[in-house]
Amino acid sequence: MKAFMDKDFLLETPTAQHLYHDYSAKLPIVDYHCHIPPQEIYEDRRFENIAQVWLGGHQVLADGSDYYFGDHYKWRVMRSNGVPEEYITGDKPDRERFQKFAESLEMAIGNPMYTWCHLELKKYFGYEGVLNGETAEEVWNLCNDKLQHDPKLTVRGLIEQSNVAMVGTTDDPIDSLEWHKKIKEDPTIKVVVAPSFRPDKVLNIRKEGFADYIHKLEEVVGRKFACANCVVSALEERLEFFVEMGCRASDHGLDYIPFTETNAEKATAAFKKAMAGETLTKEEGDEYTTYLLLKLGALYKKHNVVMQMHYSCLRNVNDKMYRKLGPDTGFDMIAVTDCSATISSLLSALTKEDACPKVILYSLNPADFDMLGTILGAFQDDEIPGKIQLGSAWWFCDTDDGMYQQMKTLARLGLLGNFIGMLTDSRSFLSYTRHELFRRLMCNLIGNWVENGQYPNDEKALKKIVEGISYYNAKRYFNL
C-alpha cells in the first residue's frame, strides 16, 4: 500500500516521477484566469485564521447590501453533508465553521476538494497528517499560528513561495483598476498581476440589470449611447485602458455561445428595445450579442488580447438561495447546450475578416470536449502554435478524471504538446497547489504512454513537452 500523498503521489511509473520531479515541479506558475482580489495583493493581506482563507464569509457593504465571499466548492461540500447554512455563509464563529468543514471533508473521498486541502496543508503549513473532525483543533491551532506569524504566509508571501509568474484577475470594463495601477507602480511586487476584460454585463442584454449597467458604462466614458456601435466604441476605449494596465486576456461567461445573421441595425434595434425596458426575444438578444462578440473579437485581435469563452453553465438554479445569498455562492450546474454550429460560425466569421484572435474555449460539460477538439483544428493558423485552445478542465470538470479526459481529448484530436496548461479559477491564495495536482496528472499520463511504448523515451522531446505544458506555452501565449 502506498503512503498517503507522498512525494510520488499519483506518479505511477518511474518515467512519470522523473518528468514531474526533474522538469515540471520546479517551473513557475502562469495562473492566467482566477478571481482573487488585486487589492489583497497590494495590501499584502494577512489572514487571521484558516477559516477566513478557506471558507470566506459575509460582510455588509456600504450600501447596506449583503455580500457573501469565499470558496463555493467548499460550501457545496458542507451543504452535501447536511451542515446548516449558518455555519457555511452565516455568522457562526470561525472555529465552529472550520469544525463543520473538517467533519464534512472526512466524507469527501474521491472529491478533488480532499486532495486540494491536504496539498495546501502540506505545502503551506507543513502538516503531514489528515484533517477530520478529530484533528480539526490541532490543524486549527497550527494553521492560525503560522498565518499570524510566518512572513511567508501573507498574500504576497504565498504568491512568492508558490513561484507564481503571473496572476490574471477577472475585472469588469467599468473597473478603475486602481489596485492594478498601484501594483504596477510598486517595485517590491515581482509577480505580474494582469487585469482580464470581462464584459458579461454588456453582452447579457436579456438579463435583469442590463440597462442599469449600461448607464454605469456611460458614466465611465462620459457619453450617452444611441446605438450598438456606441457601446462598441465605449468598450474599445475601456479595452485600451485595460491594455495599458497590462491586460493580456478577455473572458466571457456565457450561458451559450450564440451566432446568428446580424448587422449594426439589428443590434441597435435590440439595444434600444432593451434600454426602453421592453422584453427581447431570444433571436433579438442573439442578434445583439453576436454583433458585439464579432466586434470584440476583432478588437482583441487588434490589441493582441486572448479571447476566453466559458459556456454551458446554468447559474443560480436554486432561486430561494440565490435571492438570499446572491450569485457565485454554489448554486450553479452543468448545462446541456449544442453550440457546435454557433462556435464554428463565430470563428469562421472572424477568420473571414482576418480578425480572429487567440481563443480559449471552455465548456462546463465534458460531453463537449470532442466537439471542441475538432473545432480547434479547423481554425489554427501560423500566428502561434496552438492559437485556438481547448480550455483546461473547468470547475465541475476540475477533477482527476476531468483533467485526464481533457488532455486525452486534446492529444487525440490536436496537439497536447502545445497546451497552455492549468489555471486555478479560484478565489483562494492557497489554491496554487491545483497546478501541482495538474502537473502530477499530466506527467503520469505522459509517463504511462512512454512506459507502454506509445511514445519513445526521448529525453529531449519529453522535456520540451512537459516543460511547455507546465509553463513555457502559457508564457508564450500570454506574452510574458
Residue ranges and their predicted role:
Residues 1-303, 355-357, 361-373, 377-480:
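Metal-cofactor-binding active-site regions of metalloenzymes
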Residues 43-44, 320-322:
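Short secondary-structure transition/capping segments
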Residues 307-309:
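C-terminal amphipathic alpha-helical interaction region
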Residues 313, 318:
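Hard-cation-handling environments
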Residues 322-334:
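Active-site loop ensemble at the mouth of alpha/beta enzyme cores that anchors a bound cofactor
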Residues 336-343:
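Divalent-cation-assisted or electrostatically stabilized phosphate/pyrophosphate-binding catalytic cores
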Residues 346-352:
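Short, basic/hydrophobic alpha-helical segments
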